[in-house]
């Protein structure tokens, strides 16, 4: 006999029925309302969703600007324990638990083990400053007069129980604490800088912050104030699991070993045999186990290693095909690239490794697998795609608004980006937003000559000493005036020549300018970006590259 069915043939039907049952249960799930009319008064300063905690309901009607001298629960708490929350901050129950549980854990759990840890949750401010701190450490961490004055202020604040050591990103903490490269004063200074800056901060942007001024003198430049958030999600995961998309299923004949396939050609020649072999293989327990194994390897092992060990970041969540992470702004492109390559097990091209200065020690990606410290991990493979959204924001920007922008960026990558794309939204503190959406791959199945490579190379070009960032501003000025009557094919040489000319005028080598002009023009007119105007592609790419190339992020200085 050619094939004898067994009970396993019922698995696809059973899975489909259970999937429909679970989907229908969601649509009829009850969501009871809060009793007595729900929330009242002003909302939590952090989440903006629930009323803030109080011992007197009348206090809930006091506007934020008038709470300073009111006898609220939070003003009482801050007066007794200054490090409990920020000045004037009034939190709801959930936000309070999130704010206080790290302190409780440190005092009641780590304290039993004689581990001296004040804080282990990385704040957005600390993450932003970590970009400048890493550069300071690479310069040998000189203390100088400014550093000594900051250490004195740290002693005074600690004596008053008004100072917590900052939790630095793991990568930076390892560099700081391992070996004998840095002494006790340098280590203490690095861990107290963010806290000292926050202690002297004010809601008034014009207010003088003496601590921030001293930190600027210590670091040699104004401390970095921007950080990034990443949200990555696998594409069409439902179709991969349910097997409803034929493009994500192999033909039955392709699941056999090549030698067996050759024998089958000679032995099974009847039409019904060929119809069976050409049919798409139905979903099975082994397929679901393979997908589960691949997603576990990515989420539980690779995601944290990439975000926290190879970049200055903090993994917030990793489950299956979903990843959310905080990352220092100078590591944004590197983190995005490594996460995407790790999801599908794609090799990272050498030019990207060099340009982004990727840390691949102990990690090898390729062939749908990863080899991490000698451990082989199965991944989703090159045909599985993932889309990512990223937001660059000021550390003082409302986190709720930043998260909404992050989710919108991820939807933009999956919607207008056409999936297998990344979207970066740049939120400048002065106002306005730049939205860049690019595919991960154009024509090749790998990341070679990818749009990310173009973006990374432009960032490195502007960060160098030869090319002025003025090239980005000048180009953005004439982009809106492109002739609308020209088709994309005719527009390519015009864009390439003009981009090369502008780059050469601002100091780029002629051959290099021609190369970058051609790459950027090719990206702008590519059919994959047909829904986006070429002018918008170039303008937004240059804007993001120029922002990431500024001295506080690139570490390069030039004559002004």
Which ranges hold each PLM region?
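Regulatory and interdomain segments flanking nucleotide-handling catalytic cores
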Residues: 1-560
């Amino acid at each position: 006999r050619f094939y004898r069915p067994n009970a396993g043939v019922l698995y696809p039907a059973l899975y489909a029925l259970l999937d429909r049952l679970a989907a229908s249960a969601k649509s009829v799930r009850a969501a009871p309302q809060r009793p007595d009319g729900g929330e009242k008064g002003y909302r939590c300063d952090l989440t903006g969703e629930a009323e803030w905690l109080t011992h007197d309901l009348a206090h809930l009607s006091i506007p934020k600007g008038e709470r300073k001298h009111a006898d609220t629960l939070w003003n009482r708490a801050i007066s007794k324990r200054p490090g409990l929350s920020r000045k004037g901050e009034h939190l709801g129950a959930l936000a309070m638990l999130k704010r206080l549980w790290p302190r409780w854990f440190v005092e009641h759990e780590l304290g039993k083990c004689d581990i001296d840890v004040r804080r282990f949750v990385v704040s957005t401010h600390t993450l932003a400053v970590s970009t400048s701190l890493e550069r300071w450490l690479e310069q040998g961490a000189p203390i100088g007069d400014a550093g000594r004055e900051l250490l004195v202020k740290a002693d005074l604040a600690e004596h008053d129980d008004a100072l917590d050591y900052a939790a630095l990103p793991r990568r930076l903490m390892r560099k700081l604490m391992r070996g004998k490269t840095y002494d006790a004063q340098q280590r203490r200074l690095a861990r107290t800088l963010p806290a000292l800056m926050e202690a002297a901060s004010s809601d008034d942007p014009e207010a003088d912050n003496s601590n921030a001024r001293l930190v600027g003198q210590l670091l040699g430049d104004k401390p970095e104030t921007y950080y990034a958030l990443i949200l990555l999600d696998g594409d069409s995961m439902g179709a991969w699991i349910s097997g409803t998309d034929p493009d994500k299923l192999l033909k039955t004949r392709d699941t056999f070993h090549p030698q067996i396939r050759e024998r089958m050609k000679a032995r099974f020649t009847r039409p019904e045999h060929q119809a069976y072999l050409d049919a798409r293989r139905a979903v099975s327990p082994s397929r679901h186990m393979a997908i589960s194994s691949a997603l576990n390897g990515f989420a539980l092992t690779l995601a944290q290693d990439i975000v926290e060990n190879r970049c200055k970041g903090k993994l917030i969540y990793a489950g299956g095909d979903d990843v959310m992470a905080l990352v220092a702004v100078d590591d944004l492109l590197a983190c995005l690239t490594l996460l995407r390559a790790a999801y599908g097990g794609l090799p990272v091209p050498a030019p990207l490794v060099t340009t982004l200065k990727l840390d691949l020690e102990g990690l090898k990606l390729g062939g749908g697998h990863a080899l991490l410290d000698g451990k082989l991990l199965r991944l989703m493979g090159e045909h599985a795609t993932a889309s990512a959204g990223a937001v660059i924001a000021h550390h003082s920007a409302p986190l709720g608004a930043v998260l909404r922008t992050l989710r919108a960026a991820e939807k933009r990558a999956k919607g207008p980006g056409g999936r297998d794309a990344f979207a970066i939204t740049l939120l400048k503190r002065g106002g306005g937003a730049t939205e860049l959406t690019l595919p991960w791959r154009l024509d090749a199945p790998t990341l070679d000559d990818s749009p990310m490579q173009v973006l990374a190379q432009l960032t490195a070009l502007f960060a160098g000493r030869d090319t002025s960032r003025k090239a980005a501003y000048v180009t953005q000025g004439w982009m809106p005036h492109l002739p609308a009557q020209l088709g994309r094919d005719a527009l390519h040489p015009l864009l390439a020549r003009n981009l090369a000319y502008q780059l050469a005028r601002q100091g780029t080598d002629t051959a290099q300018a021609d190369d970058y002009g051609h790459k950027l023009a090719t990206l702008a007119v590519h059919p994959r970006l047909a829904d986006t105007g070429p002018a918008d592609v170039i303008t937004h790419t240059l804007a993001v590259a120029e922002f990431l190339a500024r001295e506080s992020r690139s570490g390069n200085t030039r004559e002004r």
